[in-house]
Regions:
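Catalytic core of pol beta-like nucleotidyltransferases
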Residues: 6-96, 100-107, 116-180
């Protein structure tokens, strides 16, 4: 499979682009399926809970990358590490910021936030739990950056589920931005 991610403003040109790409692929005499997508298409796969497609794109071997794929790759590797450690406690792992808005460049940071379900934790205070979780999750940032071999800085905000919902009830503007 070959996936070509084009800017959103080029969406209307897909009927012109696809035949050219298919012609180039046929010249190679390889059996390659061509998929042309936009970043919005990728985010919609995530919204539709089709994470395996995003995983495949982030694990791909890019022929050309303007920074989008590298940023997606480092976030996906970090997500995998966090899920492996806290599997049943991760309520949400979300990519936000310029990457999702489509304004990121190759040097842009990658904004993510993780919401951890703390509702069954009884043996430590929420502050102690949050400090411990942040330490582990921040250690995974270094590991993900090394594995992804990208320069994009991964910024991770860690929230406990009870604190997140309390902030939503208090109409905290940051939480409403995340929900949007």
């Amino acid at each position: 499979h070959m996936i070509m991610i084009i800017p959103e403003e080029e969406y209307k040109n897909i009927p012109k682009i696809k035949p050219e790409i298919v012609k180039l692929v046929k010249e190679t005499k390889e059996n390659i399926w061509v998929h042309i997508k936009t970043p919005v298409d990728l985010w919609n796969y995530g919204l539709d809970s089709k994470y395996e497609f995003l995983d495949a794109v982030s694990a791909s071997f890019p022929i050309y990358d303007n920074g989008f794929l590298g940023a997606l790759r480092v976030a996906n590797i970090h997500k995998t590490l966090v899920l492996r450690k806290f599997e049943k406690y991760v309520a949400s792992y979300v990519i936000a910021g310029s990457l999702v808005r489509g304004t990121a460049d190759k040097d842009s940071d990658v904004d993510t936030f993780v919401i951890i379900d703390d509702t069954d934790v009884k043996k430590m205070t929420r502050i102690d739990l949050l400090d411990r979780l942040r330490g582990i999750i921040y250690d995974y940032i270094r590991e993900a950056s090394a594995l992804a071999v990208v320069k994009n800085i991964l910024n991770v905000q860690v929230y406990l589920l009870t604190d997140f919902w309390q902030s939503v009830k208090d109409a905290h503007p940051v939480m409403f931005t995340f929900i949007r």
